[in-house]
Design a protein with these regions (language model features):
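Hydrophobic alpha-helical transmembrane bundles that constitute the permease/transmembrane domains
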Residues: 11, 23-31, 204-215, 267-270, ...
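Helix-loop-helix
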Residues: 291-308, 314, 375-448, 453-454
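Short intracellular "coupling" helices and adjacent cytoplasmic loop segments at the cytosolic face
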Residues: 44-51, 58-62, 70, 142, ...
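Membrane-embedded alpha-helical segments of multi-pass transporters/permeases
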Residues: 30, 34, 215, 219, ...
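Conserved catalytic Walker-motif region of ABC-type ATPase nucleotide-binding domains
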Residues: 240, 362, 450, 479-481, ...
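An intracellular "coupling" helix at the cytosolic face of ABC transporter transmembrane type-1 domains
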Residues: 12, 245-246, 262-271, 275, ...
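Membrane-integrated ABC transporters
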Residues: 1-32, 36-204, 209, 213, ...
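ABC-type nucleotide-binding domain
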Residues: 15-16, 51, 66-71, 84-97, ...
Length: 729
């Protein structure tokens, strides 16, 4: 999988942008629970009062607190506040206070405020305890208190600040500040509303920021993944185009199609998720753990239980689903293979009435794929409800454990809510990672299959220092002691093949089925490389020149005509894109294709369906021959290309071909002797060996194998005339 990232080397800018946006999104997500906690703790419970450092105090309160503090703490408080005289109070926002002077807080740093909050909270608690004693000493005032107020005052009187939890001290201090604000005449409800509105606005701003970051990451991830899939398809296509028959034999056509479409699609989907989650999930997990530790470290055991439960579920899914993902890809290959075979051989299936058998084959492949898909989908379906059960169970466990802390005054309700949200973020981080982990096996299998193509060592390569063809030997083909053995085969199919095909002459190859004719001819365009010996074109070993330069010299017509979707003109121009319409028409005339082309309504602009399925076999073959002629090459290779033509068309075509292309070298593989009667040189093959070489007349007298072929195809009169011509010569 990591090998595929090398194709994104130039895309580092969007990758960096994705990472930065994910960091921003994670930071905002981790901040939201803090605001939720503040709304509950500060906005609702504390009436919008954030800490025990009041904005303003009465002079008597200030002096009372100062007397209860250590000298250093008292000095710090003195520095933090400024005394307002009565006249200054009248001109300030505290003008409603008429009873004396006020101490107003100056601007202080966050660090100094936190330190002052601790010292002032304790002083306020002590001052509250003194006030309790005064109330209890006043029997009339004490009698007016409710039972709950009396109980609270008794607790405050007897409790030492050293034994009290920080939350109790903080809440008592906040109550003191609230009473102080009321005494000054401040509107507590307005303060609370203002705090809630400001905090809510901040949360909305964060939510929009999260949304913008998430949308941007999604767009960038989708573009990067799409770019990677495009590059992979290009690389796979380029690699497959460089394959020889040897490499093609290692992959079925259906498998190559699946790898270049479905497998790359799997990689694209995984990459889209990977870019979004691979950075985000760890940030959320680590950040959530840090936040939990700062909120209440004693309750982290609840999260540990949830994480362990999730890891167990993921482990089980991995053990169960991983092998099935590998099987799934092979079954897709199998289904594609069966489908392709059925569609390709539909006419044969109907002719032999084997529709039922093919239906059973297809049903088996289809059912195997369906069963495996159902198994995988059931496993994936099991994951989400299990995860939700774990998350909901964890929430209940946290509430149960947090309730006792709240009851003991060790935790506030808002902190519990924040703890639950952080716990869910940690669990979601592991859930995201598990989703990536679950998709990874299938993507990993797909990546391995794509890499099998990309890493395939091509046997036929261009030389590092290519040579040029010799111009004085234009079109000459020479075989020197050539042996050839198919890859992984034990025996050679060609043995010590040596001959020269002179430039501008016709050399034909004939022999029984399996004698090696097509194999020999396919060595010239380097569909395979010789095992021993050498093949020279224009006096240069074909392994020493570029494959492109070699193929530029060759006009190749395969046994089975192959056409591409487009038009007749685009197919005939396939080997020479800049061919003029006159050159195209000339090629069609030589190939005896003009008549059926002119009969069509759109003539040369007539559409050709995929694989040439809308033309007959003979028409397809003539268009394939015309395509090679339009290229006007130095060397023509006809690999049994005339067998699909009727005898009359065959004769006309070869006659025109001989007249119009007499300057080119022509190599013909034939089954019919009538096709090669007038060849300048006929080479007879038998079991991979040359057993005869000469003209038709010469071989009738000297080659037994050729004689057998001739007797099976020609009449006695034809044979007699040939012998008479030979004797006369």
């Amino acid at each position: 999988m990591l090998k595929l990232f090398r194709y994104l080397k130039k895309a580092y800018v969007p990758v960096i942008a994705i990472v930065l946006l994910l960091i921003l999104q994670a930071s905002c997500d981790l901040t939201l629970p803090t605001f939720t906690s503040n709304i509950v703790n500060v906005g609702i419970q504390q009436k919008g009062i954030e800490d025990a450092v009041p904005d303003v105090m009465r002079e008597e309160t200030f002096l009372a607190l100062k007397s209860l503090m250590k000298q250093d703490d008292a000095d710090d408080m003195e520095d933090a506040y400024k005394l307002y005289t009565k006249d200054q109070v009248k001109d300030s926002k505290y003008k409603d206070y008429k009873d004396g002077r006020l101490y107003v807080r100056r601007y202080i740093s966050k660090k100094d405020r936190e330190y002052l909050d601790t010292s002032m909270s304790k002083a306020m608690l002590k001052l509250s305890a003194q006030m309790v004693k005064q109330i209890q000493a006043n029997s009339q005032a004490a009698a007016s208190l409710s039972k709950s107020q009396k109980k609270m005052m008794a607790q405050m009187k007897n409790m030492d600040t050293k034994d009290m939890p920080d939350t109790i001290i903080s809440q008592a201090a906040i109550s003191f500040v609230t009473s102080e604000y009321k005494a000054i005449g401040l509107d507590i409800d307005q303060m609370q509303t203002h705090y809630l509105l400001v905090t809510g606005a901040k949360m909305i701003g964060l939510a929009f920021l999260i949304m913008a970051a998430a949308v941007s990451v999604t767009l960038l991830s989708a573009r990067l993944a799409a770019k990677l899939s495009r590059i992979l398809r290009e690389k796979v296509f380029e690699k497959v185009m460089s394959f020889t028959n040897s490499e093609f034999d290692k992959f079925s056509t259906a498998s190559l199609i699946t790898r270049s479409t479905n497998d790359i699609q799997q990689i694209q989907m995984f990459m889209t998720m990977l870019f979004r989650i691979v950075v985000y999930a760890p940030l959320m997990g680590i950040g959530g753990i840090f936040k939990v530790l700062t909120t209440n470290a004693k309750m982290t055991w609840t999260i540990a239980i949830g994480v362990i439960a999730i890891m167990l579920v993921i482990f089980v899914l991995f053990k169960v689903a991983m092998p099935k993902f590998k099987i799934l890809q092979k079954l897709i290959d199998r289904l594609n293979l069966v489908t392709r075979e059925i569609l390709t051989g539909l006419s044969v299936i109907r002719a032999f009435s084997t529709e039922k058998h093919e239906e059973e084959r297809f049903d088996k492949a289809n059912m195997d794929l369906m069963k495996t898909n159902l198994f995988v989908n059931r496993a994936m379906t099991f994951m989400m409800p299990t995860m939700m059960l774990i998350m909901n169970g964890l929430t209940v466990l946290i509430v149960y454990a947090g309730a006792s802390n709240i009851d003991a005054g060790k935790m506030q309700v808002g902190d519990l809510m924040a703890f639950i949200q952080y716990a869910m973020q940690i669990i979601m981080a592991f859930l995201f990672i598990s989703m990536v982990s679950i998709m990874m096996p299938r993507a990993q299998v797909a990546a391995e299959r794509v890499n099998e193509i990309l890493d395939m060592e091509v046997m036929i390569k261009d030389p590092e220092e290519p040579k040029e063809f010799l111009p004085e030997k234009k079109g000459e083909v020479e075989f020197k002691n050539v042996y050839f053995c198919y890859p992984d085969a034990d025996e050679a199919v060609l043995h010590n093949i040596s001959f020269t095909a002179p430039a501008g002459k016709t050399t034909a190859f004939i022999g029984s089925t399996g004698s090696g004719k097509s194999t020999l001819i396919n060595l010239i365009p380097r569909f395979f490389d010789v095992s021993r010996g050498s093949i020279l074109v224009d006096g240069v070993d074909i392994r020493d020149v570029k494959q492109h330069d070699l193929c530029e010299k060759i006009g190749y017509v395969p046994q089975k005509g192959v056409l591409f979707s487009g038009t007749i003109e685009s197919n005939l121009k396939y080997g020479k894109e800049d061919a003029t319409i006159d050159e195209v028409k000339r090629a069609a005339r030589i190939a005896q294709a003009t008549d059926f082309i002119e009969e069509k309504e759109e003539k040369y602009d007539s559409p050709i369906a995929q694989g040439g399925s809308n033309v007959s076999g003979g028409q397809k073959q003539r268009l394939s021959i015309a395509r090679a002629i339009a290229k006007d090459p130095e060397i023509y290779i006809f690999d049994d290309s005339f067998s699909a033509l009727d005898y009359k068309t065959d004769v006309k075509l070869r006659s025109e071909l001989q007249k119009e292309t007499n300057g080119s070298t022509t190599l013909i593989v034939a089954q019919r002797i009538s096709t090669i009667l007038h060849a300048d040189q006929i080479i007879v093959l038998d079991e991979g060996n040359i057993v005869g070489k000469g003209t038709h007349e010469e071989l009738l007298n000297t080659c037994p194998v050729y004689q057998q072929i001739a007797k099976s195809q020609l009449s006695e009169d034809d044979l007699k005339k040939a012998r008479e011509v030979s004797d006369h010569e």
